[in-house]
Design a protein with these regions (language model features):
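Hydrophobic or amphipathic alpha-helical targeting/insertion segments
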Residues: 1-3
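Post-kinase regulatory C-tail/linker adjacent to protein kinase catalytic domains
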Residues: 9-17
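Long, charged amphipathic alpha-helices with heptad-repeat/coiled-coil character
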Residues: 17-169
Length: 170
């Protein structure tokens, strides 16, 4: 619950050398470590996914920037060819080829932009999964803590009753 790396048992429970108490402490410690490691492992996998998606986005953005430069170049070439065509110094087929290339690369930019957005959505969903995992873990820890505190209260009451009984018989 407090993001600790180990369980802190009450001093009275730490001092008890009864084999059942020692075994219970060890068991709870092992369960705690296993659950914490599993939780951290899940979060680590999700963080790696975010990192991979971020790297993919960077690559896609680089491709998009390159395509945008290409579109700019095609746009300038189309403009120049239209002027030359008007003066009779250019081939109409050449202009149509450049216009097709311009349209094709513009479509590729749109596809890259869409893919980037999809990856950004996946990052958001993965971050939400991490938050949900942390919340679920906290809820489980709080529930387990409540159970343990109830058991501890019960045991302490029985211990007090037993001590009282022993004190009266002595």
């Amino acid at each position: 619950r407090d993001q600790r790396n180990q369980i802190s048992f009450p001093d009275e429970l730490q001092r008890m050398s009864d084999p059942h108490v020692v075994e219970a402490r060890q068991g709870e410690t092992e369960i705690f470590i296993a659950r914490k490691n599993a939780h951290q492992g899940e979060i680590s996998v999700l963080n790696q996914r975010i990192s991979q998606l971020s790297s993919k986005i960077n690559g896609l953005q680089g491709q998009r920037a390159s395509k945008q430069e290409l579109v700019k170049s095609y746009g300038e070439e189309v403009h120049d060819l239209k002027e030359l065509l008007a003066e009779g110094f250019a081939d109409k087929q050449r202009l149509r080829d450049i216009e097709r290339n311009y349209a094709m690369v513009t479509g590729e930019i749109a596809a890259l932009t869409s893919e980037i957005a999809g990856n950004e959505i996946q990052i958001g969903e993965t971050k939400l999964q991490i938050l949900q995992l942390k919340k679920k873990f906290q809820e489980e820890v709080a529930a387990k803590l409540g159970e343990v505190q109830a058991k501890l209260y019960d045991v302490s009451q029985r211990l007090l009753a037993t001590r009282d009984k022993v004190a009266r018989t002595v």
